[in-house]
Curated annotation (Swiss-Prot):
Family label: Belongs to the snRNP SmB/SmN family.
GO molecular function per UniProt: RNA binding; snRNP binding
Domain of life: Eukaryota
Record-listed Dimethylated arginine modification sites: 108, 112
Subunit description: Core component of the spliceosomal U1, U2, U4 and U5 small nuclear ribonucleoproteins (snRNPs), the building blocks of the spliceosome. Most spliceosomal snRNPs contain a common set of Sm proteins, SNRPB, SNRPD1, SNRPD2, SNRPD3, SNRPE, SNRPF and SNRPG that assemble in a heptameric protein ring on the Sm site of the small nuclear RNA to form the core snRNP. Component of the U1 snRNP. The U1 snRNP is composed of the U1 snRNA and the 7 core Sm proteins SNRPB, SNRPD1, SNRPD2, SNRPD3, SNRPE, SNRPF and SNRPG, and at least three U1 snRNP-specific proteins SNRNP70/U1-70K, SNRPA/U1-A and SNRPC/U1-C.
Keywords associated with the record: Cytoplasm, Methylation, mRNA processing, mRNA splicing, Nucleus, Repeat, Ribonucleoprotein, RNA-binding, Spliceosome
Compartments where located: Cytoplasm, Cytosol; Nucleus
Name of the coding gene: SNRPB
Composition-biased stretches (Pro residues): 174-205, 214-240
Protein name: Small nuclear ribonucleoprotein-associated protein B'
């Protein structure tokens, strides 16, 4: 409902009003709002009702109840009267203004993190783990190293040249066996003790293809000068 500025109801806003209902109850509260149906909103409202005695000899007594915020229906309203003027603090801002004088307190920003000088709580022994970025193994130890890396080979070569024993990591096998003069090639059995191992192929010739033509097999003496050697493998000897 559109209410004009000259309405009498607007003149009583924030006043203490006494509202009498049809059943005889009286509501006294601060008048805050209304509508076209005369529904009222009262705050800090108190209810007063008269209680009739059981005997005619006793006087009628009045009972008070504190209600607070009340929405009062207009159909039950009989009359409204002004009980008192508006409170003195009506219209005063609850929030302090920018130019208002400050109080004795000191405004400080909310702290972030742990304040200085406060000891850090320590975890029980056995439950404290490594803090990220503090302590723990170095980056070189945590770097994964594969078999036959260039760094491992260079370190082993440097240690062997210096005469220090080379240490190999556990679980990756021991050092490779030394390749001596009489060591058998891979895949062949070693000769019995006391027997000279067979001679390997000459330099520059791939193993496993036999000896060149005109040369005896390993372990045999060459023929005397002027005499033909044995025929090559796969050929029949000449007839006499």
């Amino acid at each position: 409902m559109t209410v004009g500025k000259s309405s009498k109801m607007l003149q009583h806003i924030d006043c203490r009003m006494r509202c009498i209902l049809q059943d005889g109850r009286i509501f006294i509260g601060t008048f805050k709002a209304f509508d076209k149906h005369m529904n009222l909103i009262l705050c800090d409202c108190d209810e007063f009702r008269k209680i009739k005695p059981k005997n005619s000899k006793q006087a009628e007594r009045e009972e008070k109840r504190v209600l607070g915020l009340v929405l009062l229906r207009g159909e039950n309203l009989v009359s409204m009267t002004v009980e008192g003027p508006p409170p003195k603090d009506t219209g005063i801002a609850r929030v302090p203004l920018a130019g208002a004088a400050g109080g004795p307190g000191i405004g400080r920003a909310a702290g972030r993190g742990v304040p200085a000088g406060v000891p850090m709580p320590q975890a029980p022994a056995g439950l404290a783990g490594p803090i990220r970025g503090v302590g723990g193994p170095s980056q070189q130890v945590m770097t994964p190293q594969g078999r036959g890396t260039v760094a491992a080979a260079a370190a082993a070569a440097t240690a062997s040249i210096a005469g220090a024993p080379t240490q190999y990591p556990s679980g990756r096998g021991g050092p490779p066996p030394p390749m001596g003069r009489g060591a058998p090639p891979p895949g062949m059995m070693a000769p019995p003790p006391g027997m000279r191992p067979p001679m390997g192929p000459p330099m520059g010739m791939p193993p496993g293809r036999g000896a060149p033509m005109g040369m005896p097999p390993p372990g045999m003496r060459p023929p005397p000068p002027g005499m033909r050697g044995p025929p090559p493998p796969g050929m029949r000897p000449p007839r006499p």
